[in-house]
Amino acid sequence: MQPRHGNGHTAANGAGAAPLPDPRVLGLRMAALYCYWQRTDGPDLPQLTTALVAHVGIAPNTPIACTCRNAAAAVGRWRGRAYHSARHHAEVATNAMVLAAVAARHGNALPPRDLGILLAAALAHDIHWEPARQQVRFALEAKAAATLDAIAAECGVAADERHAMRALVLATEPHCRADLAAPERPAPRGMPESLAELRREPRLLRLAALLSDADLLSSAGLSPAWTRVQGQRLARETRTALGEAERRYFFDAIVGPGFLSPGGQYFAANLARIRAWRPQAGQPADVLRPA
């Protein structure tokens, strides 16, 4: 039985837990789970959300728990596309909770309230995503943040917690990782004020780094094979062939030097292996074409 904190939350920590597996083994286990979801047209996102809410120690009758459940239901109704889908949200939410658990094992535990805010943002960060010929920075993230904010307001979430959720969703903008990694640099032109404020708040910056890593973990931190599956999904969604140039751009311009959070850094060896992976001699060129 875990100790219960105030506000109906229970601590989630690594005390007495089994040792962490090797990062490669953990990555393969997570990829196997996600592969099973893909084969079975899963998961049941509301059911997964209920389990994750209980895992992090949030009482089911709290506003944050309500927000997580309602966000999952909204994403399930939307369903999404080949890559930006309900399953992607399930993976990112699971990744976020795994990264938080890994960090807790290394003495960087998050309080249940922050885990709940993180979970809510993960569950809705790409809702209503749609392709565009010319993407405007933060436009899609602002749309998702507004959707989550409306859900949170209806559930009675406090203003400061809603502000945090909005900022975390904005921080998943693909090119934002460099801004999170160097918060001392001036905010780039066009950055929303709430995100600029996040970079000055260590607590929120920590959550944003974790969510950004969770958003990329399935594509860059589990296994080369699962990275390829992610590329196939994206190729179908964009109806574009993705080759070595796109691969280099993803790792250089989006992922950057490495993961940002303590939990993400645990998977650094996996990232290095995936970044260096190339097709073996005699295998087809690593070009992913839309189905």
Residue ranges, per PLM feature:
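Surface-exposed cleft-lining segments at the edges of enzyme active sites
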Residues: G57-A59, E130-R133
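Acidic/histidine metal-binding catalytic segments
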Residues: H106-I117, C155-E173
